[in-house]
Amino acid sequence: VLDSSSSNQKPLNIGFTLGDPAGIGPEIFFKFQQNFQNNPNFNILLIDDLKAYNQVLSKIKLGQPSGFCGEHCYHSLKKADFLFRQNQIDYLVTGPVSKESLWMAGLNFSGQTELLASINQLNSDDIEMFFVLDDFRVVLATRHISINQVSDNLKKRLPRVLDNATNAMQSIFKIPKPKIAVAGLNPHAGENGIIGKEETEFMSRMLNHFSTKQIADVNGPFSADALFARAAQNYLNNRIQEYDLFVAAYHDQILPLIKGLGGFRAVNLTAGLPYLRLSVDHGTGFDIAGQNIASCEGLLACTQLILKISHREKAKFA
């Protein structure tokens, strides 16, 4: 741990994984470490075993997925889980990992979110993937699946997503009764069944049923283009969002907008694990690996969100 304990308040211990050794994860971590290792608000704990990391580097080519990389990432996540249970870290920030590397290592998971659920012996449906850009917060109703599986998966998951997301908004963001907007699946939210029937056949019914719990103010399903265009305008004009949380029906319904608006400032947050895990909102950057041009802004955004969640939002970065 690189101690930066000059603050009167005990610094947070934040654990970092490098991500895929063949990508930009190691580069952005060491840049972040160099710039912020003396910050009094947090200690930086590198979870990866550097000896093992260097051994992996000798077996791979930068910019290419490899089973060696996938295996290294798995062991880093296992070690992170162990360190949390030993009370050695307070938060986890993960570097980007190639899903192909995981699969080449025999780890048939669609991403680190699902892998962390497995490590914690949780059903992946019990954890949720949030994306946070200031007060523009989004949760994905379906995650890393093909588009032809979205409708069935949405029908299965939507009620649980609403429950899990509401719990996360209450416990993490301290919003007692969040105002939630749900995007429809089809263009124009199906136009009352003319374009698609998911909204009329099950989405509206599920939202109405969830509303009876009176634990959140749930609205929708709305036409996604109008809903997210308004959210984008609010963000660009520094206006407070009308909703505390937006629910996107599928991955690419919202991620292009979040990444376009926020660049590296958007943060991927996993809710439902025994600890809070955050990650940069970008991939492994295989195309620029080893060129020393990658930005560590995503790791800075993760750390800023941790400070905000832990009620240290006024903390300054050295």
Regions found by a protein language model. Name each.
Residues 1-115, 155-267, 273-318:
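Contiguous, glycine/small-aliphatic-enriched amphipathic segments in soluble metabolic enzymes
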Residues 119-136, 271-287:
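Short, flexible loop segments at boundaries between secondary-structure elements
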Residues 130-160:
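Ligand-binding beta-strand-loop-alpha-helix segment within the catalytic cores
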Residues 44, 113, 127-128, 136-139:
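Small-molecule pocket liners
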